[in-house]
Amino acid sequence: MNRILLILILLISLTTKLFSNPNIQARTGILVDYHSDEILFELDPDAQIYPASMTKIMTAIVAFDLIKTNKLSLNDQFTVSENAWRLSQAGYSSMFIMINDQVSVEDLLKGIIIASGNDACVALAEGIAGSEQNFADMMNEKAGEIGMTSTNFTNSSGINDPDNVSTVTDIALMSKYLIKNYPNYYELFAEKTFTWDRTGGEPIKQGNRNPLLYKNVGVDGVKTGYLAVE
């Protein structure tokens, strides 16, 4: 089994000339200047893809919108369901929350953004909307508002689902919305570690799942995503 790494990067200032003849082994991709919206490079940008963990960008945006309108607080506590806990036991990237743990929205967001925890996504989605499906409806409503015309979300984590689809064009729109509207929260995407002080156990420290943060190439956040393929 191989893994496909999906990476989207929005860079602040690069010249078009630099990317006139890129050597990129990918089926689809896009590079956008944040300030001007100029497309510096694109490769079949409207091809349908499975966004994998880049789905979590929208999960965070929905939460940030609710916090902004005082419908949610970073200090709110959500109870972890068995449904959320099971994802921490399934070999996926996890925050390692346990059934009936009381976890703050702030910790869940860090678990999602830094540790890319699928279990944290479900706990947050259920806490906000009552079910992950209801939360996915909120995600799709927001996607429509942003202008993501080729995207459909079916879950909060990006876990494999043939109907959870997007394009790199839409992901670029979503990423810019995040950076523009929530610059303070966007800083979380650049944090290299997160320590979960779990109940009844030793703290769990995890590194950011974005490998580009460690390569000193000027990347300041957003997400990567992995898909397993036969």
What function would you assign to each model-found segment?
Residues 19-172, 176-180:
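Active-site-adjacent loops and short helices of periplasmic peptidoglycan-processing enzymes
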Residues 148-149, 160-165, 169-230:
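Domain-terminus/edge residues, biased toward the C-terminal soluble/receptor-binding domains
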Residues 4-13:
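Sec-dependent N-terminal signal peptides
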